[in-house]
Curated annotation (Swiss-Prot):
This is Small ribosomal subunit protein bS21. Keywords: Ribonucleoprotein, Ribosomal protein. InterPro entries: Ribosomal_bS21, Ribosomal_bS21_CS, Ribosomal_bS21_sf. The keyword Ribosomal protein applies.
Amino acid sequence: MSNTTRVRKNESLEDALRRFKRSVSKSGTLQEYRKREHYEKPSVKRKKKSEAARKRKF
C-alpha cells in the first residue's frame, strides 16, 4: 500500500511532511517494513511469542 501526500495550495513543505508522517504512522507502513526487513523463521516467531507470554505472566 502506498501513501501519497500532495502539497496543497499555500501549504508549507513542513506541514505536508507532517501530514505524510501521520498517514504513514496510521497505516502501519513503517512497522510492517521493519517487521519484514529480515526473515524470521516460524520457530523463532513461536519462541518469541512464548517468551512474551511468559514475561506477561510474571
